[in-house]
UniProtKB/Swiss-Prot annotation:
Complexes with CDK1 in early mitosis. LATS1-associated CDK1 has no mitotic cyclin partner and no apparent kinase activity. Binds phosphorylated ZYX, locating this protein to the mitotic spindle and suggesting a role for actin regulatory proteins during mitosis. Binds to and colocalizes with LIMK1 at the actomyosin contractile ring during cytokinesis. Interacts (via PPxY motif 2) with YAP1 (via WW domains). Interacts with MOB1A and MOB1B. Interacts with LIMD1, WTIP and AJUBA. GO terms for cellular component: centrosome; cytoplasm; glutamatergic synapse; midbody; postsynapse; spindle pole. Residues 1-71, 148-216, 228-276, 292-317, 363-407, 432-492, 513-630, 1104-1129 are annotated as: Disordered. Autophosphorylated and phosphorylated during M-phase of the cell cycle. Phosphorylated by STK3/MST2 at Ser-908 and Thr-1078, which results in its activation. Phosphorylated by MAP4Ks; in parallel to STK3/MST2 and resulting to its activation. Phosphorylation at Ser-463 by NUAK1 and NUAK2 leads to decreased protein level and is required to regulate cellular senescence and cellular ploidy. Residues 1-11, 46-64, 578-608, 620-629 have a biased composition (Basic and acidic residues). It is found in: Cytoplasm, Cytoskeleton, Microtubule organizing center, Centrosome; Cytoplasm, Cytoskeleton, Spindle; Midbody; Cytoplasm, Cytoskeleton, Microtubule organizing center, Spindle pole body. It comes from Mus musculus. Its main location: cytoplasm. Its EC number is 2.7.11.1. Residues 525-654 are annotated as: Interaction with YAP1. This is Serine/threonine-protein kinase LATS1.
């Protein structure tokens, strides 16, 4: 019947792997015996005998009918082989060993219409040099001669037609049986598979000759044609190579006749047992695709091409015929594995075929044989035949090695994967017949004669030749299903591997076991079917699509099968579904279910093909690529992050304890009742909980609306901004990461963030949030509307001594508060002293501040081995003016000289030499005393009107500072009081005798501050100067900003981002530079620092600030954790 057509009730079955034969001896011994017997075989074949066998097969189990390979010329040789294998056949007959089917398969091959002429012609063309040569010639002829394909297809069709829908299960490609028989028979050294022999010469022609005559290949062709998962031939592929396959179990109610009415020779039995393990697994894999019987390396008869259930007898003969070379292993049907009783032949065929498509090729007689003991599936017979059939694949551990050694399992998996993709795909089978074509041609010519049994070819070529049937059967066989009794020796397993023409089969192997495993899971209830996928495939075998297994040349091992196969191998899902369907149907062994399942599995198989292991792996690679896009960090970055993170976690804990202690102290001072105290404790706990949650909130610049720029710095700007949600006013300081990195200011920025976060006093500008984006760092701080001290100095010129005394007293308290926190400001100057609306000062710009912490060391943030100079460690040119030879460079170094000079000038931007202590400039080591030097210089400037060491260039200024003993002069015209002059002289001197060495109290005790009461809060006293502020956003106290210096938004940001990314990638700068930068203050009152937006109600600062501190602020007066993410309550 035409490809794609299926006999009514026909069910496409996937070829099943045949269990290893019962051969008692080692697989190698069996193979050697087979090899020897094949060498001594005579080529004449008894056509009549073959026909008799074929008829016998067809009568015994129409399902098992496949195009019987004709071994007309070699019939005698085949008979001799059968005789030598009778002992094994007897053993396998009990287990339904395929050896019994051998005589029948010969007859079936002849009855199937395989011409002996092809075999004869092959022998003539090859001058009877060897069986291998004849098989190769027949393979080529079968590929080239479509007529023979039609003949082989026609031979298979009658069998399909004869099959009964009820009993007929889709012929299962018995490639495995072919594999098992042949591999077990043929020594492993025959590397190439039959397909290879057909399409390619076997790897070891000698071994091929030794193997003896494989089936003329007609059997394989018949198998390929008859193998359509439907069990009926869809378009007959070019005659697939004939492979010995165990016929499917006889239809229900029928007792499967032993394969080949005569049991295979005893020699076959042992080999079949041995093969059952290795051969079954390997051959199921490699034999699933039809291979010329002669090509089967392992001596396993090539799996018969189970085109349709109608061909079971011929299939059995084929299996035998492929074996007839004298090494034809007896292949038990998968059903026999399940110990299907003859009474259950129909069930066995249905289940066995679905489970082991290859086995269906074996005559029902062989099916009736129980699988060799290694296959535990025998008990599956107890199950309903259909259950056994469909569940057989599931019941035997798919690739679980239930009965088959894992060594066999692995090779079988390899070939199984390939074959699974080939099985049930008519297109693939058609394509595969190339490798199986030689056997197919031989089959039309009655080609059991093919003298050249290419053992290597059978292994791989089977998997390739019977893409459809082979895969289906292979999947089933690859599982340790008892369905196939094909004797398989470990050697055959190795051979399939040798036969593998492509590395991809290994990938297939990986997936193939998955398919069988998955299939068995759905069908696990039914143990008889070891390969659930096989079961599914058997269901797909019903649909004509699956039933068109054309075994032309073996297509490229894996991908092509997947692409071309449609239903032969159900995809994982399809397999599982058919298994589920078949499980219910297993008891029935209903072909209708199989056909329906086969249709579904066909579609699923297409999907499965689409999702071949290769495709899956490719997808995984894509995922890996996506994962690789995630930035990976260096060990240094990890170390840096973990050190800071752990330090901050511990710090946060200490701050929580401190806040709790503050609350207790405040409640004790106020004298709250116990109930009130409990209520306050609960409130604190709630705030702590909210803080832990809220500090993880993300912040970005979109939360703030910029109102006006207040100032531009070396690498940042300060703007007045309003928070969108609370409408509160803040001063936002923005730093470009690019500039921070270029100027090596990472450590300074980290120090500034730490001091602002930890500082919780009125002398330091309060930091509310710090966060960052890819380009910038952001500090959100109190807005101080009074401007800075430098602006006031410029406007007033010289301060009255009382005003100077007031500001210096507050500055002393502010510096003391910084020192108490363990920091050194290092950059105390009028520019960094802000005046609030009440006239009191606050320190800001802690860019040069340091806490002598490892995170504040600029060298810690440098990548590479080139140490960069700390920004506060001035260059050597500062030390000695003569060292700066910027103009004395050689012309080739002029460009470098210019950069060197710029470096000198840059230091004037980082710490003006006018206010820097000499020990800092000399880098002789400095302490907190350096800040007191700056206080003396500022006092001098307030009273005199200019800095004491003013010079034309920073270099000269530095030299004056270093030589302060000679350069420091208080001009008499300034008319300073003796106390003021004395304080200046005592502050501006060497650190060893500088005032403040013993603490700030020394300075407070100086006569200059005799009118200042440091015991009371200076901030509560009225200031001598109160700035004028007309409205909340008044910025008149700040110097106007040059419009040309304003930051421009736009393309520059993109360039900055690109630059940063390039630096990080090139390792120029460490990626951990800005770790742990984000921060959120513990009590920020939802953005209202004083419960009202600033500075509208700024006059309430004191009252509300005191209220906050009395209850809550005291709890949190310590600055919120250093590294708390910015979160707003």
């Amino acid at each position: 019947m035409k490809r794609g057509e299926k006999p009514e009730g026909y069910r496409q079955m996937r070829p099943k792997t045949f269990p290893a034969s019962n051969y008692p001896g080692s697989s190698r011994q069996m193979l050697q015996e087979i090899r020897e017997s094949l060498r001594n075989l005579s080529k004449p074949s008894d056509a009549s005998k073959a026909e008799h066998n074929l008829n016998k097969m067809s009568t015994e189990d129409p399902r098992q009918v496949r195009n019987p390979p004709k071994f007309g010329t070699h019939h005698k040789a085949l008979q001799e082989i059968r005789n030598s294998l009778l002992p094994f056949a007897n053993e396998t007959s009990s287990s339904r060993s395929p050896s019994e089917v051998n005589p029948q398969m010969f007859q079936d091959l002849q009855a199937a219409g395989f011409d002996e002429d092809m075999v004869i012609q092959a022998l003539q063309k090859t001058n009877n040099r060897s069986i291998e040569a004849a098989v190769e010639f027949i393979s080529k002829m079968s590929y080239q001669d479509p007529r023979r394909e039609q003949m082989s297809a026609a031979a298979a069709r009658p069998i399909n037609a004869t099959m009964k829908p009820g009993n007929v299960q889709h012929s299962i490609n018995r490639k495995q049986s072919w594999k098992g028989s042949k591999e077990s028979l043929v020594p492993q050294r025959h590397g190439p598979s039959l397909g290879e022999n057909v399409v390619y010469r076997s790897e070891s022609p000698n071994s091929q000759a030794d193997v003896g005559r494989p089936l003329s290949g007609s059997g394989i062709a018949a198998f390929a044609q008859a193998h359509p998962s439907n069990g009926q031939r869809v378009n007959p592929p070019p005659p697939p190579q004939v492979r010995s396959v165990t016929p499917p179990p006889p239809p229900r109610g029928q007792t499967p006749p032993p394969r080949g009415t005569t049991p295979p020779p005893p020699s076959w039995e042992p080999s079949s047992q041995t093969k059952r393990y290795s051969g079954n697994m390997e051959y199921v894999i490699s034999r699933i695709s039809p291979v010329p019987p002669g090509a089967w390396q392992e001596g396993y008869p090539p799996p018969p091409l189970t085109t349709s259930p109608m061909n079971p007898p011929s299939q059995a003969q084929r299996a035998i015929s492929s074996v007839p070379v004298g090494r034809q292993p007896i292949i038990m049907q998968s059903t026999s594995k399940f110990n299907f009783t003859p009474g259950r032949p129909g069930v066995q065929n249905g289940g066995g075929q679905s489970d082991f498509i290859v086995h269906q090729n074996v005559p029902t007689g062989s099916v009736t044989r129980q699988p060799p003991p290694p296959y535990p599936l025998t008990p599956a017979n107890g199950q309903s035949p259909s259950a056994l059939q469909t569940g057989a694949s599931a019941a035997p551990p798919s690739f679980a090695n239930g009965n088959v050694p894992q060594s066999m399992m692995v090779p079988n998996r390899n070939s199984h994967n390939m074959e699974l993709y080939n099985i049930n795909v008519p297109g693939l089978q058609t394509a595969w017949p190339q490798s199986s074509s030689a056997p197919a041609q031989s089959s039309p010519s009655g080609g059991h004669e093919i003298p050249t049994w290419q053992p290597n070819i059978p292994v791989r070529s089977n998997s390739f030749n019977n893409p459809l049937g082979s895969r289906a059967s292979h999947s089933a066989n690859s599982q340790p299903s008892a369905t196939t009794v094909t004797a398989i020796t470990p050697a055959p397993i190795q051979q399939p591997v040798k036969s593998m023409r492509v590395l991809k089969p290994e990938l297939q192997t990986a997936l193939a076991p998955t398919h069988p495993s998955w299939m068995p899971q759905p069908v696990q209830t039914v143990q008889p079917t070891p390969f659930s996928e096989g079961t599914a495939s058997s269901v797909p075998v019903i649909p004509p699509v699956a039933e068109a297994p054309s075994y032309q040349g073996p297509p490229p091992p894996y991908p092509k099968h997947l692409l071309h196969q449609n239903p032969s191998v159900p995809p994982y899902e399809s397999v599982s579904k058919p298994c589920k369907d078949e499980q219910p149907s297993l008891p029935k062994e209903d072909d209708s279910e199989k056909s329906a399942d086969s249709g579904d599995s066909g579609d699923k198989e297409k999907k499965q093909i689409t999702t071949s292991p290769i495709t899956v792996r490719k997808n995984k690679k894509d995922e890996e690529r996506r994962e690789s896009r995630i930035q990976s960090y260096s060990p240094q970055a990890f170390k840096f992050f973990m050190e800071q993170h752990v330090e901050n976690v511990l710090k946060s804990h200490q701050q929580r304890l401190h806040r709790k202690k503050q609350l207790e102290n405040e409640m004790m001072r106020v004298g709250l009742s116990q109930d009130a105290q409990d209520q306050m404790r609960k409130m604190l706990c709630q705030k702590e909980s909210n803080y832990i949650r809220l500090k993880r909130a993300k912040m970005d610049k979109s939360m703030f609306v910029k109102i006006k720029t207040l100032g531009i710095g070396a690498f940042g700007e300060v703007c007045l901004a309003r928070k969108v949600d609370t409408k509160a006013l803040y001063a936002t300081k923005t730093l470009r990461k690019k500039d921070v990195l270029l100027r090596n200011q990472v450590a300074h920025v980290k120090a500034e963030r730490d001091i602002l976060a930890e500082a919780d006093n009125e002398w330091v500008v309060r930091l509310y949030y710090s966060f960052q984006d890819k380009d910038n760092l952001y500090f959100v701080m109190d807005y101080i509307p009074g401007g800075d001290m430098m602006s006031l100095l410029i406007r007033m010129g010289i301060f009255p001594e009382n005003l100077a005394r007031f500001y210096i007293a507050e500055l002393t308290c502010a510096v003391e508060s910084v020192h108490k926190m363990g920091f050194i400001h290092r950059d105390i100057k009028p520019d960094n002293i802000l005046i609030d609306r009440d006239g009191h000062i606050k320190l800001t710009d802690f860019g040069l501040c340091t806490g002598f912490r490892w995170t504040h060391d600029s060298k810690y943030y440098q990548s590479g081995d080139h140490p960069r100079q700390d920004s506060m460690d001035f260059s050597n040119e500062w030390g000695d003016p003569s060292n700066c030879r910027c103009g004395d460079r050689l012309k080739p170094l002029e460009r470098r000289a210019a950069r060197q000079h710029q470096r000198c000038l840059a230091h004037s931007l980082v710490g003006t030499p006018n206010y820097i202590a000499p020990e800092v400039l000399l880098r002789t080591g400095y302490t907190q005393l350096c800040d007191w030097w700056s206080v003396g210089v500022i006092l001098f400037e307030m009273l005199v009107g200019q800095p004491p060491f003013l010079a034309q260039t920073p270099l000269e200024t530095q030299m004056k500072v270093i030589n302060w003993q000679t350069s420091l002069h208080i001009p008499p015209q300034a008319k300073l009081s003796p106390e003021a002059s004395d304080l200046i002289i005592k502050l501006c001197r060497g650190p060893e005798d500088r005032l403040g060495k013993n603490g700030a109290d020394e300075i407070k005790a100086h006569p200059f501050f005799k009118t200042i009461d440091f015991s009371s809060d200076l901030r509560q006293q009225s200031a001598s100067y109160i700035p004028k502020i007309t409205h909340p956003t008044d910025t008149s106290n700040f110097d106007p900003v040059d419009p040309d210096k304003l930051w421009s938004d736009g393309s520059e940001e993109e360039n900055i981002s690109d630059t940063l990314n390039g630096w990080y990638k090139n390792g120029k700068h460490p990626e951990h530079a800005f770790y742990e930068f984000t921060f959120r203050r513990f009590f920020d009152d939802n953005g209202y620092p004083y419960n009202y937006p600033k500075p509208i109600e700024y006059e309430y600062i004191h009252s509300q600030g005191s209220e906050q501190q009395s209850d809550e602020d005291d709890q949190h007066t310590s600055s919120d954790g250093n590294n708390r993410d910015l979160v707003y309550v």
